């Protein structure tokens, strides 16, 4: 499973990229607004850091304007993926953009049926939301499992991006459920790298070395 980072914070992206684990980036209007910067400016800078799919979301909810925004965003860089919300207008926009060779990521997926419609409309990626489904008492990972099984049975090429990831356990569950990608906040990526026994082991190694050879040898 590939790892994307879910943020518009360039410094977080830079730090995560240095780890050598990133394959792409996802952003959304909320994340862009949090940074207080121009969308195109942020996206262009992200593209200079990560050589992989970069999802940038349209703002309009009317399909003609979605198409217009998508075309303009796609001109920024060859790696741009147009992120479009799951709705009737969004499906129409995905259908047009996909026929033009523009990659799309249908977001705010909360059911396997939504994922099927998005895939058939031509979406490159679908993004089911784990955490938000968990919030309402559903098991988000079950939706990912259903989508993965359905796509495999019907040989659908659309890739699954597990989104709304809040914990390392979400990442593990997504990987085991067959998701192609998980898009993960920076803090969760760092949490994934930590384990109490690792810290204890490193501390013991250092103490043993210093005891045997001294600090300056």
Swiss-Prot record:
One cellular component term from this protein's GO annotations in UniProt: cytoplasm
Q: Which UniProt keywords apply?
A: Cytoplasm, Pentose shunt, Schiff base, Transferase
**EC number(s) of the enzyme?**
2.2.1.2
Give the main location.
cytoplasm
Q: What is this protein called?
A: Probable transaldolase
What does the sequence similarity comment in the record state about its family? Belongs to the transaldolase family. Type 3B subfamily.
- Which branch of life, at top level? Bacteria
Question: What is the top EC class of this enzyme, as a single word?
Answer: transferase
Cellular localisation:
Cytoplasm
Q: Secretion signal: which residues?
A: none
GO biological process terms, alphabetically, are:
carbohydrate metabolic process; pentose-phosphate shunt
Q: List the gene name.
A: tal
Q: Which GO terms describe its molecular function?
A: aldehyde-lyase activity; transaldolase activity
The pathway is:
Carbohydrate degradation; pentose phosphate pathway; D-glyceraldehyde 3-phosphate and beta-D-fructose 6-phosphate from D-ribose 5-phosphate and D-xylulose 5-phosphate (non-oxidative stage): step 2/3
Reaction(s) this enzyme catalyzes, per UniProt: D-sedoheptulose 7-phosphate + D-glyceraldehyde 3-phosphate = D-erythrose 4-phosphate + beta-D-fructose 6-phosphate
């Amino acid at each position: 499973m590939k790892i994307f980072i879910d943020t518009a914070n360039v410094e977080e992206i830079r730090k995560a990229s240095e780890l050598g684990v990133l394959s792409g980036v996802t952003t959304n209007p909320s994340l862009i607004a949090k940074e207080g910067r121009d969308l195109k400016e942020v996206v262009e800078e992200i593209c200079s850091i990560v050589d992989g799919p970069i999802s940038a979301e349209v703002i309009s909810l009317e399909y003609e304007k979605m198409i217009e925004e998508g075309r303009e965003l796609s001109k920024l860089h060859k790696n741009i993926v147009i992120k479009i919300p799951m709705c009737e207008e969004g499906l129409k926009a995905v259908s047009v953009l996909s026929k033009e060779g523009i990659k799309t990521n249908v977001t705010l997926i909360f059911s396997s049926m939504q994922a099927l419609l998005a895939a058939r409309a031509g979406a490159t990626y679908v993004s089911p939301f784990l955490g938000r489904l968990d919030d309402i008492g559903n098991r988000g990972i079950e939706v990912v499992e259903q989508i993965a099984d359905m796509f495999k049975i019907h040989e659908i090429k659309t890739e699954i991006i597990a989104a709304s990831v809040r914990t390392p356990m979400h990442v593990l569950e997504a990987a085991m459920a067959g998701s192609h990608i998980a898009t993960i906040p920076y803090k969760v990526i760092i949490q994934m790298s930590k384990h109490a026994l690792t810290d204890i082991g490193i501390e013991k190694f250092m103490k043993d070395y210093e005891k045997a050879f001294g600090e300056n040898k």
